[in-house]
Regions:
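Histidine-centered divalent metal-coordination motifs
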Residues: 92-98, 275, 311
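Alpha-helical scaffolding within the catalytic cores
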Residues: 165-170, 198-203, 227-228, 291-295, ...
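Conserved, mostly hydrophobic/aromatic
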Residues: 92, 174, 265, 332, ...
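Catalytic pocket-lining loop regions of alpha/beta-barrel enzymes
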Residues: 239-246, 250-355
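Active-site gating/metal-coordination segments in enzymes
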Residues: 65, 180-274, 278
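Mid-to-C-terminal alpha-helical segments outside catalytic/metal-binding sites
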Residues: 7-17, 29-82, 86, 103, ...
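Twin-arginine (Tat) signal peptide motif
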Residues: 1-7
């Protein structure tokens, strides 16, 4: 059996742990939804480089040093050289994950380099990296195969990439980019054992002594009968936000099962961070869960809850923009969107509703930062709001 066949077999086995969706209402996912995703990909590829910022293609993450905001240091690592940036808050980051049979990661270890899931600097020259498309459009077929391989490894023998997604490595990259704090968002997979990234990450952060800079979040699984009790325990540990991932956890955001969770978050002032929209590289059977219209019920029913829509709706950003315009209790994480779309988000949603996020360790922190610096050139107040002010207010329980 070759590597690709072996990977497919393992992937099917891993998928069986969570399973495809049960039958649900046909209107939950229509043929027109499938067609719109295909059209978005086609149109984005066609329009790349034709927006207000022209072509923005670079040779790997190190290639971002061609921009006036970065340089390569003595170790050939990317470093931000903008001197007047605010203390940046990354509202969308993670640590390495290991679950089921995989050995526990040493989150306090330091390695020579970080192996991002899109490892654009693994080769010299690096892979072509386009800042004017949704970020995962930069994944080539081999990159996706590697990502799938590492995803399976996180549940079995252990992921070599995930072993580099540690606290010292994250802090090193944060320091190089001028990022002061990062919100770490775990995901409960609903597995029978070895599935408590929230507690493990919190313990690692405490052991590192870096709790002022790294802010662990909470997570619950919608079908966990003890979800509310679990949430309260995580909040007692100091959780900064609740992460829910409809695609990975296979639920609709408007499911009645989550009503007590939303109500609790409103009561205690805890932001709810949703993965939002279809990224386009996840299993197709999960696409139905993340359509923007499925977030409407929860957001409308809980105006007291501060919701964050991750990835600005990903490839469904065209639906996410009017959704955010309609609901004043929705903030938008800008991670993943290209520079032309980021400009549109500022103009139509408003800079005061946008949050800087990196989705580290999928990508280098500089990938998201570069886009903000390009689009906010000459607009210091907009830059400060996106990189710091909005997140600081949200973490302080303000905004509504």
């Amino acid at each position: 059996m070759d590597r690709r066949s072996f990977l497919k077999t393992l992937g099917l086995g891993a998928a069986s742990l969570v399973g495809p969706p049960a039958c649900d209402s046909p209107e939950r996912y229509l043929d027109s939804d499938i067609e719109r995703l295909a059209e978005q990909k086609r149109r984005e590829k066609e329009q790349s480089g034709k927006g207000p910022y022209g072509a923005q293609r670079y040779s790997g993450y190190r290639g971002l040093a061609d921009l006036p905001y970065f340089e390569l240091d003595a170790n050939n690592d990317l470093r931000c050289i903008v001197e007047d940036l605010p203390p940046i808050i990354d509202f969308h980051a993670h640590l390495g994950m290991s679950f089921l049979f995989a050995p526990t990661i040493d989150w306090l270890a330091r390695t020579e380099r970080v192996q991002h899931f899109l490892d654009c600097d693994a080769t010299n020259p690096g892979c072509e990296f386009d800042l004017d498309v949704y970020v995962n459009a930069n994944f080539r077929e081999d990159d996706l195969a590697t990502l799938n391989w590492e995803s399976v490894a996180q549940a079995t023998w252990g992921s070599g990439a995930a072993a580099t997604h540690t606290i010292p490595n994250l802090i090193r990259e944060m320091d190089a980019m001028g990022i002061e704090r990062a919100v770490l968002l775990p995901i409960s997979l609903g597995l029978p054992f070895n599935d408590d990234s929230s507690a493990l990450w919190s313990a690692a952060v405490e052991a590192s002594g870096l709790g002022e800079r790294l802010l662990p979040g909470a997570t619950v699984h919608p079908r966990d009968p003890n979800a509310l009790e679990s949430l309260r325990a995580q909040v007692a540990r100091g959780a900064s936000a609740l992460k829910l991932h409809p695609a990975v956890q296979r639920f609709y955001p408007d499911t009645p099962e989550l009503e007590p969770i939303y109500a609790e978050c409103g009561k205690i002032g805890l932001p709810v961070f949703f993965h939002g929209g279809r990224a386009g590289i996840e299993p197709e059977y999960t696409h139905r869960y993340t359509l923007i219209r499925h977030y409407e019920g929860a957001v409308a029913a809980h105006p007291e809850v501060r919701f964050v829509l991750g990835h600005a709706g990903a490839r469904d950003v065209a639906d996410a923009i009017p959704f955010a315009q309609k609901h004043r209790n929705v903030w938008v994480d800008i991670h993943g969107q290209g520079v032309s779309v980021l400009r549109e988000l500022i103009d139509r949603v408003g800079a005061h509703r946008l949050l800087f996020g990196s989705d580290w360790p999928f990508y280098h922190l500089g990938a998201s930062l570069a886009k903000v610096l390009i689009v906010t050139e000459g607009s210091p107040e907009v830059r400060s709001a996106i990189l710091h002010g909005n997140a600081a207010s949200l973490l302080a329980g303000e905004g509504l």
